[in-house]
Amino acid sequence: MAAASGRAVTLLRVVFGVRQLGPTAAREWGARLSSLFDCQRRCVSCFAGASFSGPRLASASRHHGQSSAMDCFLGLSQPDGSLTSRPPGVSMHRDEQDLLLVHRPDMPENPRVLRVVLLGAPNAGKSTLSNQLLGRKVFPVSKKVHTTRCQALGVITEKEAQVILLDTPGLISPVKQKRHHLELSLLEDPWKSMESADLVVVLVDVSDKWTRNQLSPQVLQCLTQFSQVPSILVMNKVDCLKQKSVLLELTAALTEGVVNGKKLKMRQALRSQPGTPCPSPAVKGPNTQSVGGPQRIGWPHFQEIFMLSALSQEDVKTLKQYLLAQARPGPWEFHSGVLTSQTPEEICANIIREKLLEHLPQEMPYSVQQRTVMWEEGPSGELVIEQKLLVPKKSHVRILIGPKGHLISQIAQEVSRDLMDIFLCDVRLRLSVKLLQ
C-alpha cells in the first residue's frame, strides 16, 4: 500500500504546475494520502442550508480519487488504473468551464465521433439514461413531467471515440404546449437536434402500462420525417414486467415485427400463449399510417433493440459500448475533459428544480422562481452557493420551508450531495424562501 501510495503522489500539484518529489518525500505524502482516504466524509446541516465536506488535498477533486475537468485540460488527470475510472467532474468556475468548451480537442490520430439524440415521451427516463451513460448525474431527473426544459448536451470520450448525447425534452404536441403555456423550447428542441443527429435512441418505459404499447404520435412523426437517420429502440425497466410474454408482445408491436430489415421470429416463443397472434410486418407509406390500414403504432426500421433493467448497470454498459462502436471517423467536437456543455450555475439550478419537483405537491414546483445571489469559492476551496426561491403565495412559503424548516433543509442537503459529486469539491448551499412581490 505504501509503495502504491508513493507512486500515486510522485507528482504534487502546485497551483497550475507540478513539482517533482523525491522518494522520501513521496513516501511521506503517500502516508498522508492513505490516512486521508481512510477518513469518513463529514456532513453538517443547518436550517435552509447544508454543508458537505471531506478530506482535502491540493486539488478539490483529489479527495474523491477523481480528476476534475480542469485537471484533464492541464494534463494532470490520473492515468488508467487509478482509484476510479469515472469521468471527470465539472469545474465550479464558469470561466474554467467556458475555457474548456472552446479549447481545441485533444484528439488521437484516428478520431471517431457520433451525435446521438434521445427521443421519447415526457417522463420516459431519457435524462436518467443519459446520466447512467455519462457516469455522473448532470441532468435533472424527476417523476413529474417536463423536468428537462431545453436541450442539454453530454459528452462521453473513450480512447478514439467521442459520443455526444443530446438529452431532449419529451416530445409534445403544439396543442399541449399552448394549453399548458409551456416554453417553446419543449416543442422545438427535439426537432432541431434531429437535424445534426447520426443516431436516434428511442426510449420506452415498459413499466408504464398506459404508454408502453405504442410509440407516441410525436415520436413516430419525428422518425418518419428523419427516416434517413439510423435508429435503435431501448426498452427500459424490463425487470418490472412479471410476465416476460408481455415483453415479446411489446417488442413485436413497437417494431411492427421487423428489426434491421428482418422479420422477428416470435411464433415459437409465443406458442405457450393461446390466441396470441404472431405479428408480421406491413407495407407502410411515407406517413405514420399503414397503407390501407389503421394508425401506425410502431417503427419497422430500428437497427437494434436494447432491453435495460433498472437494477443492472451491465445493460447500460452494453448500450454504451454499442454507441462508442458506432462512432464514425471524424474530428472530435470537444476536449476529452468536457462532460457537459452546461454552465455550473445551470447545473445547480436544474438540480434544485429537480428536488422541488420531487418534494412539492401538484403544480406548486412549476411556479417557483430561482435566483442565485451568491456563487463563490470559500477559503478552504469549497463552493459556497446561496439561492433565493421566490413563490407567489404565503401558503407556498410555509409548505416549502416545512415544519421547523425540515423540508427546505432536506432539499438543501440532497442538492449539496449531488453537486459535490458533479463539481468534485465540498459544497455549502443555503436556500431561502421569499414571497414574490
Curated annotation (Swiss-Prot):
Gene: ERAL1
InterPro entries according to UniProt: G_ERA_dom (IPR030388), GTP-bd (IPR006073), GTPase_Era-like (IPR005662), KH_dom-like_a/b (IPR015946), KH_sf_prok-type (IPR009019), P-loop_NTPase (IPR027417), Small_GTP-bd (IPR005225)
Binding residues for GTP: 120-127, 167-171, 236-239
Renumbered residue ranges of the record's region G3: 167-170
Family note: Belongs to the TRAFAC class TrmE-Era-EngA-EngB-Septin-like GTPase superfamily. Era GTPase family.
Residue numbers spanned by region G5: 308-310
Domain Era-type G: 112-330
Any Pfam family matching the protein: MMR_HSR1
CC terms in the record's Gene Ontology section: cytosol; mitochondrial inner membrane; mitochondrial matrix
GO molecular-function term, one example from the UniProt record: GTP binding
Region: G4, residue numbers: 236-239
Lineage: Eukaryota, Metazoa, Chordata, Craniata, Vertebrata
Modified-residue entries (Phosphoserine), positions: S173
Protein name per its UniProtKB record: GTPase Era, mitochondrial
